Amino acid sequence: MYDYAFVHLKFTVPAAVLLTAIAYPILNRIHLIQTGFLVVVAFTAALPWDAYLIKHKVWSYPPEAIVGPRLLGIPFEELFFFVIQTYITALVYILFNKPVLHALHLNNQQNPPAWMRVVKVTGQVVLVALSVWGWNAAQVHQETSYLGLILVWACPFLLAIWTLAGRFILSLPWYATVLPMFLPTFYLWAVDEFALHRGTWSIGSGTKLDFCLFGKLDIEEATFFLVTNMLIVGGMAAFDQYLAVIYAFPTLFPKVNRYPTTHMLLQSRLINTSRYDLERIEGLREAVERLRLKSRSFYLANSLFSGRLRIDLILLYSFCRLADDLVDDAKSRREVLSWTAKLNHFLDLHYKDADATEDPKKKAERIDAYIKTAFPPCAYQALHLLPTHILPPKPLYDLIKGFEMDSQFTFHGTSDSTDLQYPIADDKDLENYAIYVAGTVGELCIALIIYHCLPDMSDTQKRELETAACRMGIALQYVNIARDIVVDARIGRVYLPTTWLKKEGLTHKMVLENPEGPEVIERMRRRLLENAFELYGGARPEMQRIPSEARGPMIGAVENYMAIGRVLRERKEGTVFVRMEGRATVPKRRRLSTLLRALYEQ
């Protein structure tokens, strides 16, 4: 009795609920629009086709297996299947595509490799051929009619999607397309086999090939679920392609609202691919790789941001990392000061040498010319793509001041080693340094978040949020210093204040020679961590005021970094993995659980 409703209650609804619970922290309005749009399209496209199948006895349902109500002869349970299948597959697609930065996969739109052209054309030819064969097979009531009806209905839609987004789909990682297609398909095959075995629905004799993939699962039913999931995944990917165009190219879409409009999506579809700035895509690829190699915590958290905010955060990190590397890789203090002077001049060209009458294109060319002459080629993209039109100047200049403080250190074993200087004399110097190198980054991140998510935020709220972000940045830097005492000593740096050392009867030289040694160093490490967690405790509640789209990922990034501090505080064998000869590390499972907890709590 009511077997079809039982199938939903036992299989499809629980799967949808579970996927919703898993995906909930990362779902945003765009995902809901994507999924809702595809549900409407799937329902509308399947309605007349399904009605035709039932009318011509291809599909049938025992009266006792359904509740009763119908639309165009289709049981309500079947109508619900259109919706629930689309929803399930869309959620699986969203989950597997969240780590993917789709903008990186627009690079094959202008000059695709030969293999991609061949695959796309081959796919088009095959889909046309299957459509024609399906049309012929569906004309007569014979064993191939059900398979023909599936193909003549689905293949034209697949052809349209493949023509519009084939190159983009081929550019995506296999796990972002193949798994969302096949995982729901395998699950629904099992559900369908169960229903066919129970007689919940049946395929009319004489309309099928009578070949089963396994058990009672007819090859036609297996084909149906495969091609419909291909349609759903293809539709989601096509949607993501046009979103990626909007987010990736500010020259084509200078201002993107919180959520792109339908008009913008249509524009992105109609824009000629020759206008795509592929140099920007390559620069973004460099930035992502720099992020992946240099910061596991932020790399993980960044994938949870969305849209142009995610891209701008990556570009900001790339600039900060590049500037830091220029300082760290320098061979002398003089070289460090040379780099900081060049970085300051780069900022001057953007912020201080602004001439309202100067043509923006000429200004950009002038800045690019300076970048190419003053910096190595590997630095070009990080500097060129920095979104200075959004970022406030003061935190950027202060960031360079932090590098200037670093320049006062000499490098162990170099010709400068006879003139040791340690700029962090007391608590105030320590705080200033942390503000310069980390508090500024917090302020810059908040500036990007406000610009992209809540540009109408009041000035008072902005200042309060920026202050909290700065304090949180200081806390994270204290954790960083506590973690890297040994690593920093190897390059001749001691960030512990001189006043702390004197109180404990230590000198900088003693720390450099034996950074893992006396217990007093461990006491100072704990003092740094106490200061860090005190600042963290004061700033953490303020982070709840971050706009909802960015709150979870931002808090997740902070919590992942503070987990390092917790590792250092625990120091219990078997509880965590700590390498004091280098850097404390947080196990991957713990990093992931910390991030998920932060997301679910929002």
UniProtKB/Swiss-Prot annotation:
Its main location: membrane. Pfam families: Lycopene_cyc, SQS_PSY. GO terms for biological process: carotene biosynthetic process; carotenoid biosynthetic process. CDD domains: Trans_IPPS_HH. Pathway: Carotenoid biosynthesis; beta-carotene biosynthesis; Carotenoid biosynthesis; phytoene biosynthesis; all-trans-phytoene from geranylgeranyl diphosphate: step 1/1. GO terms for cellular component: membrane. InterPro entries: Isoprenoid_synthase_dom_sf, Lycopene_cyclase_dom, Squ/phyt_synthse, Squalene/phytoene_synthase_CS, Trans_IPPS_bact-type, Trans_IPPS_HH. It is found in: Membrane. Keywords: Carotenoid biosynthesis, Isomerase, Membrane, Multifunctional enzyme, Transferase, Transmembrane, Transmembrane helix. One of its GO terms (molecular function) is geranylgeranyl diphosphate synthase activity. It comes from the Eukaryota. The keyword Cell division does not apply. This is Bifunctional lycopene cyclase/phytoene synthase. It comes from Neurospora crassa (strain ATCC 24698 / 74-OR23-1A / CBS 708.71 / DSM 1257 / FGSC 987). The gene is al-2.
